[in-house]
A protein has these predicted regions:
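Acidic, Ser/Pro/Thr-rich low-complexity regulatory regions
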Residues: 2-161
Length: 161
């Protein structure tokens, strides 16, 4: 089954997937969630929420230098959002499914958004964590324009869509 592409703006950027979430989204979500909960990804997530406290790129560089265990955990953690940003931005995973999931993107983006922007500027590499940045910015738009409390979005008396 071919998944319809996201609607595009004038610059060819995806705006919104032009379809309802489906079983493929559910299966992909389950794989993402499983990855998020296991192995190094789980260790990296725990480290991030318990220990990551950099507030600027320079601070991150000094506290978690390249080659350190902490930098590895940060890369593992951000890698989850980077790979899912690819899927969501290309319409391969419906944004409603990803953004409604318990991945704490709002908390993550609040902590790493400014650092990623500084990182891109400092290195002259706008592609560094670009999908994390896209996902964080898109989440904000999605939350402001599409999110509703679950009981309003899918009333219990009506059941699933």
């Amino acid at each position: 089954m071919m998944i319809p592409p996201a609607e595009m703006d004038g610059a060819g950027r995806g705006l919104r997937v032009n379809r309802e979430p489906n079983q493929q989204d559910a299966a992909l979500y389950q794989r993402c969630f499983s990855q998020f909960q296991s192995g190094v990804a789980a260790e990296a997530r725990a480290w991030f929420f318990e220990h990551f406290d950099a507030t600027t790129y320079a601070n991150m560089q000094s506290r978690y230098p390249p080659g350190s265990r902490e930098r590895h955990l940060l890369a593992e953690f951000l890698g989850f959002y980077e790979s899912n940003g690819v899927l969501v931005s290309r319409g391969l995973l419906h944004e409603d499914v990803f953004f409604d999931a318990p991945f704490a993107l709002d908390l993550v983006w609040g902590r790493v958004g400014p650092i990623i922007e500084e990182w891109q500027e400092a290195t002259g590499e706008p592609g560094i964590w670009e999908n994390v940045a896209w996902l964080g910015k898109r989440y904000k738009v999605w939350y402001e324009t599409h999110w509703r409390p679950k009981v309003e979005a899918i009333p219990p008396e009506e059941g699933p869509i």
